[in-house]
């Protein structure tokens, strides 16, 4: 009888890890955010499926836009773009993801956010680890080829499992400006073993979706910021500490007091916007050749 649950986990693990939601609960231009955006379609190499996404340009100097009070805004001295890799429990229309996009824009970034295949507007079925890596590469190609964004102007931002995807992409592109991993884990095996009811199974033997960030992070060659809520009950913050310890300089770690897995905003000095501001300064020091520019970000 013990073999049946193991067989179930082996065969159905992709359906347990990825939870595609087709319906977008919010749009960027809904009143709560009022974000200007362009619908984009991203081609996946060697696939007929396309990824649906939103290009959200940085605010212009003349634009009045919604801001979080007492937080930094328009911090950039040269154009920069955030390539936002969401988690896999929701799609890009989730309130918390769009709140994050709005905060990025307040800081002066343009943002490309998209859904993995099978999610939201994107075509295709349940993805796999290899396929979400391919999807992130397709989004990178879109920024480089279609938007003509220089690689050093791209900050890759990954949230939860999206952090593992972002890390893989950043390793393949050491020319990127930097990497931010938020609420992410050391490996899928350890993330699953954190769930007590699954500890009875030989997860390491059954799991094919590895997402082994702890092994990979040693190969990273771009500046990195790890952010994690101290009250995260989904992925313990000590996993970000271990990733930080394994990573090479330049690196930063920001543990947000009382923040959970998704709702990470805390006002004042504990604000993740201020952490991103400090990281952006680190990125600029690491890439001093970037020309100063009064524009907020790439159009």
Task: Describe every region a protein language model picked out.
Residues 219-221, 226-228, 232:
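Short beta-strand/loop motif that positions the catalytic acidic residue
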Residues 213, 222, 236-245:
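Short alpha-helix in the alpha/beta-hydrolase fold that links the catalytic acid
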Residues 231-235, 262-263:
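Acidic catalytic loop of the alpha/beta-hydrolase fold
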Residues 45-142:
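Membrane-embedded segments
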Residues 241-264:
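Catalytic histidine neighborhood in serine/cysteine hydrolases
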Residues 1-44, 56-69:
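An N-terminal hydrophobic leader/cap segment in hydrolases
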Residues 265-279:
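Post-His helix in hydrolase/transferase enzymes
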Residues 142-146, 152-198:
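Primarily recognizes the serine-hydrolase "nucleophile elbow" in alpha/beta-hydrolase
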């Amino acid at each position: 009888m013990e073999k049946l649950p193991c067989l179930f986990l082996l065969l159905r693990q992709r359906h347990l890890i990825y939870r595609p939601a087709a319906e977008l609960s919010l749009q960027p231009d809904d009143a709560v955010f009022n974000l200007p955006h362009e619908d984009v379609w991203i081609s996946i190499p060697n696939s007929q499926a396309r990824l649906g996404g939103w290009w959200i340009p940085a605010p212009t100097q003349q634009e009045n836009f919604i801001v979080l009070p007492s937080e930094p805004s328009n911090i950039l001295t040269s154009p920069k773009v955030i390539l936002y890799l969401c988690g896999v429990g929701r799609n890009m229309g989730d309130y918390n993801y769009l709140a994050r996009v709005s905060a990025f824009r307040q800081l002066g970034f343009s943002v490309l956010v998209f859904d993995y295949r099978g999610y939201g507007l994107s075509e295709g079925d349940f993805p796999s680890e290899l396929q979400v890596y391919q999807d992130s590469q397709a989004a990178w190609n879109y920024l480089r080829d279609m938007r003509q964004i220089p690689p050093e102007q791209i900050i890759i931002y990954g949230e939860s499992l999206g952090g593992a995807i972002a890390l893989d992409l950043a390793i393949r592109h050491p020319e990127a400006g930097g990497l931010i991993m938020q609420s992410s884990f050391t490996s899928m095996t350890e993330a699953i073993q954190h769930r007590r009811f699954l500890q009875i199974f030989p997860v390491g033997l059954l799991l094919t979706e590895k997402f082994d960030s702890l092994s990979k992070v040693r190969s990273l060659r771009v500046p990195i910021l790890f952010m994690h809520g101290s009250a995260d009950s989904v992925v313990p913050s000590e996993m970000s500490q271990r990733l930080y310890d394994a990573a090479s300089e330049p690196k930063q770690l920001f543990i947000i007091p009382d923040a959970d897995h998704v709702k990470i905003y805390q006002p004042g000095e504990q604000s993740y916007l201020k952490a991103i501001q400090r990281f952006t300064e680190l990125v600029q020091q690491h890439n001093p050749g970037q020309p100063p520019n009064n524009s907020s970000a790439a159009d």
